[in-house]
C-alpha cells in the first residue's frame, strides 16, 4: 500500500481464477495488437462504484446492518461508474500498437476502516471490525490516466454521501458482493 499502487509498468501477478482470466484477456488483445497492428487500449478498471453495487455499497451495508467488516485488505481504490464510462470512451484516443495499458480508478487510496467510520457517522452507528490490516493490498496507480484526462468529476466524499443516502432511503441492490476483502483470489 505504501508504494501507491501498481503502475502500468508493473508485471501483473494474477492470483486466482478471475485475475487469471483477466490477464488472459489482456494477453489475447496484446497478441492481436502486435500481430495485426490493431490499436488497443488495455483499460484496467479498479472498483467502479454504482449505488446498487460496489465496494462502498458492501462496506456501507455492513455498517448499516451492524455486521463486522473484514480489515485484511485494508485499503482500495474506487471510481464512480459514470466517470469510468466516460474514461472508457475517451481512452480510445490513446489506443496504440503495441497495446497501451491504462489503469483507471480514483486518485485516493481509501482505507476500509476510514470508509466504514465515515459511513458510521452518516448512519449514527459504530462500525465493528474483524482482523487486522495487512501491509499490502490490491491497488492501482492511475496517475497516467489522471494526467491524460484529469481527475474524476465525482469525488470520494460525494460517493460516500450518495451511498449512505441510498441505503438510508432503502435503495435496491444487485446482491452481488465485490468480495473486496478476498486476498487469495477465491471469488
Where are these regions (language model features)?
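Glycine-rich Rossmann NAD(P)(H)-binding loop
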Residues: 44-48, 70-79, 100-110, 132-135, ...
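Active-site "gating" loop of Rossmann-like NAD(P)-dependent oxidoreductase/epimerase domains
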Residues: 1-16, 35
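Amphipathic alpha-helical segment in the mid-to-C-terminal domain
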Residues: 81, 112, 152-156
Amino acid at each position: 500500500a505504501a508504494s501507491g499502487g501498481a503502475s502500468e509498468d508493473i508485471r501483473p501477478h494474477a492470483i486466482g481464477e478471475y485475475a487469471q482470466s483477466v490477464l488472459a484477456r489482456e494477453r489475447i488483445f496484446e497478441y492481436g495488437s502486435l500481430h495485426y497492428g490493431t490499436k488497443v487500449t488495455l483499460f484496467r478498471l479498479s472498483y467502479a462504484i454504482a449505488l446498487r453495487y460496489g465496494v462502498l455499497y458492501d462496506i456501507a451495508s455492513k455498517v448499516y446492518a451492524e455486521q463486522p467488516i473484514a480489515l485484511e485488505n485494508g485499503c482500495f481504490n474506487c471510481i464512480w461508474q459514470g466517470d469510468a464510462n466516460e474514461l472508457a470512451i475517451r481512452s480510445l484516443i490513446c489506443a496504440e500498437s503495441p497495446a497501451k495499458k491504462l489503469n483507471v480508478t480514483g486518485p485516493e487510496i481509501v482505507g476500509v476502516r476510514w470508509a466504514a467510520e465515515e459511513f458510521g457517522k452518516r448512519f449514527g452507528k459504530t462500525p465493528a471490525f474483524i482482523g487486522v490490516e495487512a501491509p499490502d493490498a490490491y491497488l492501482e496507480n492511475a496517475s497516467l490516466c489522471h494526467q491524460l484526462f484529469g481527475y474524476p468529476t465525482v469525488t470520494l466524499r460525494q460517493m460516500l454521501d450518495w451511498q449512505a443516502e441510498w441505503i438510508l432511503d432503502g435503495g435496491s441492490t444487485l446482491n452481488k458482493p465485490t468480495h473486496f476483502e478476498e486476498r487469495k483470489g477465491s471469488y
